[in-house]
Amino acid sequence: MDKEWLEVCIYTSSEALEAISGILYNTGVKGVSIEDPKDIEFKKKHPGDWDYFDETLLKVKDTAIVKGYYKEDDKFNEYLDYIKKSVSNLDQFGIDKGKGLVEVHKVNEEDWENNWKKYYKPTKVSNKIVIKPIWENYDKKQEEIIVELDPGMAFGTGTHETTRMCINALEKHIKEDRTVFDIGCGSGILSIAAAKLGAKHVIGVDLDPVAVKSSKENIKYNNLDNIEILEGNLMEVVEGRANIVVANIIADVIIFLTEGVKAFIEKDGYFIASGIINSRKEDVIKKLEETGFVIEEVREEGEWVCIVSKIN
């Protein structure tokens, strides 16, 4: 393995972190780290929820930073051009890119390994669920449920507002006999949380083979045998119906999927949808209601929204 890596730093807004992470995952990125000033505020407000915390993160100010790590090869310049163009175009999708500045630095392999992992610390994201990176130690409290996670190259670390809101919604609605479908499962974090909260059976689906592999590995870390991970889209690879369908994606995809998703939800079942920026909330609600869903709850955290709807 090469001893030097290229670190691509994108200076942006908290709002754009998921979108930019997705841009990096579309390239040959070998690892991603995120520095979000909103996570620092969350830590300050919930100091008891963190077992360990890197105090240097308190120096993070108003600018969010996404860092991607690459080997220096013939494809890198192509990847870099794609990243710059994609970040520049975020405004067209109603996403505030902030500074939108892209920089490249050379870093040592050891620095890279430390950088991308040191920002992921055990985090309590709901009344019960604690997300714990597999390389960290954590003293579990009696009522807590631990989700072991190595996000690797797949999206989903548990620290983002949308993930927290989805987990809280799952915690509220899951019962022991429930079946859950997780659309765009990424690292498998929501599938694993659902299973550990008591779901009888969970199916996670993702179009990205890297995400499918990551989900399966994380399921093994958590010693679960009631989760099935499939590569593809919900309409083509899943049969049957679920009591709960959860999708932490983006507003446009949720709007596109809404009519199809309805056919996969049991009567009195729930559709938990997040990844929705606040400015698109009404668009998603309108589509859900037009499709026959009843809005049960709208959760908001920062600039993000989670909508819980129900089929009667």
Curated annotation (Swiss-Prot):
S-adenosyl-L-methionine binds at residues 163, 184, 206, 248. This is Ribosomal protein L11 methyltransferase. Belongs to the methyltransferase superfamily. PrmA family. It comes from the Bacteria. It is an enzyme of class 2 (transferase). GO terms for biological process: methylation. It comes from Clostridium botulinum (strain 657 / Type Ba4). GO terms for molecular function: protein-lysine N-methyltransferase activity. Its EC number is 2.1.1.-. It is found in: Cytoplasm. One of its GO terms (cellular component) is cytoplasm. It catalyses: L-lysyl-[protein] + 3 S-adenosyl-L-methionine = N(6),N(6),N(6)-trimethyl-L-lysyl-[protein] + 3 S-adenosyl-L-homocysteine + 3 H(+). Methylates ribosomal protein L11.
